[in-house]
Amino acid sequence: YVCENTPEPLLNLPGAFSTRLRAPRTGSMEMATYYMTSFLCEYSRALLERAIEGGYNFADCLITPDGCTMMNRAVENMELLNALGKEKEKFFFEYMEIPMKADDNGGSHEHYGIDISDKAIRQAVAEHNRVCELIRAIGEFRKGDKPRITGYEFHVITLATYAAPKYLIIDKLEETLEELKTREPDEKPYRARVLVVGSEVDDCGFIKLIEDTGAYVCADRFCYGSFPGRDPIELNRQRPARVCASGRR
């Protein structure tokens, strides 16, 4: 998937897992610029460039919400150019019209037989919320006068939760949280505590660059960060799929 507004639990049902598409260390974007023009943002063009290069051939489907126009153009070009799923008969693209149409997205069930029952969705939400709980707990260690974790380290850990299967990293996050409780704070003095706000900030090197200047990234609010992407999802008596879809910003 390509946007923070995609409801992750609906993509992380038993037998499936999601990964947020990135294009790290992108060089030339000539092919993507040819199809999308230079007026569109570098992030959307980098994704299309990587797709044309075959960097996302591991995927079995691509699901995207009706987010920004530039991201929609990137996905539309991927589909028109047949850049993904060339040798996968069941591959499909899906555009989610959320939150205006927050009903079930049954594409994964129709093509791959994925369980989309309420029970399966509630299980995926519980797993998602556990990841959110751990990330928020780890992030609390950034508040101290002498932080026990750097902003760069926190960004690397948070970024992993958008790319890896949740069930494979929960125990690693739990180990990290326990380690931080006894970790000796860095004696390095920071001249300023910085909040980084933006959209697709997925380059950990950018956070490291800020901290190498003497600042400390103590909080974040961007699409690959802990706010708002690692907000827990509170279920109620409604259909869980509807809650997941309508609850994303």
Language-model segment annotations:
Residues 1-4, 8-9, 28-32, 40-46:
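Metallocofactor- and cofactor-centric catalytic cores in central/energy metabolism, strongly enriched
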Residues 4-5, 10-22, 198-249:
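Redox- and metal-dependent alpha/beta enzyme cores, enriched for Fe-S-associated oxidoreductases
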Residues 19, 63, 94-96, 195, ...:
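Hydrophobic/aromatic beta-strand patches that form the interior of the parallel beta-sheet core
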Residues 51-57, 61-63, 67, 115-127, ...:
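Extended, charge-rich low-complexity interaction segments
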